[in-house]
């Protein structure tokens, strides 16, 4: 698999990432996203997005400009968190990459793989990447308070 490169990334930085993907299937349940996050210097979402869109021919079928895809993924990564000062330890670009990788796993195993078309893969990968994009809240307690207040307003 030809590994894409982020603009400005040095060749010696790409080599460990290349070795990682040569020995780890991106759709395997055992995939170590946190190792990828370290190797890519917090760009696991970008690498997985580029690789999945190329591997499943989404780029070719939908005639997606890879520079625009790259820019989209870089923007998604850099703006994923709503409030960077909050440093939400869960709803961040790493979580988006984790859900993307897990989604790829489920799309390629079991009965779902026989029913999926490329358009479905396109939609589900974009949804997986951005499902918590700029999410303001971090925990269940916040949501419970929010929804309790909301429902009490109708009583």
Language-model-derived ranges and their functions:
Residues 120-155:
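Divalent metal-dependent catalytic cores for phosphoryl transfer on phosphate-bearing substrates
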Residues 88-103:
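Active-site-adjacent "gating/activation" loops or surface patches in catalytic cores
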Residues 1-91, 107, 142-151:
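Non-catalytic interface/linker regions that flank or bridge core catalytic/transmembrane domains
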Residues 44-47, 94, 98, 119-120, ...:
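Generic recognition of stable, solvent-exposed alpha-helical segments in well-folded globular domains
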Residues 7, 115-117, 134-135:
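Arginine residue identity/basic-tract feature
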Residues 51-55, 102-106, 132, 136:
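Generic, well-ordered alpha-helical scaffold segments in large soluble proteins
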Residues 77-79, 102, 127, 138:
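Structured beta-strand/turn binding interfaces of compact recognition modules in eukaryotic regulators
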Residues 109-122:
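Short pre-active-site segment immediately N-terminal to the catalytic Zn-binding motif
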């Amino acid at each position: 698999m030809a590994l894409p490169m982020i603009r400005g990334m040095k060749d010696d930085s790409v080599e460990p990432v290349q070795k990682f993907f040569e020995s780890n299937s991106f759709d395997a349940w055992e995939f170590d996203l946190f190792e990828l996050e370290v190797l890519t210097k917090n760009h696991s979402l970008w690498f997985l997005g580029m690789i999945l869109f190329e591997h499943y021919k989404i780029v070719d079928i939908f005639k997606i400009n890879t520079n625009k895809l790259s820019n989209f993924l870089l923007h998604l990564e850099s703006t994923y968190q709503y409030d960077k000062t909050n440093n939400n330890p869960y709803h961040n670009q790493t979580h988006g990459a984790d859900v993307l990788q897990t989604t790829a796993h489920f799309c390629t195993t079991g009965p779902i793989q026989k029913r999926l078309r490329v358009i479905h893969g396109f939609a589900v990968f974009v949804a997986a990447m951005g499902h918590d994009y700029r999410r303001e809240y971090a925990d269940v307690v916040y949501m419970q308070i929010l929804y309790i207040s909301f429902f009490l307003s109708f009583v």
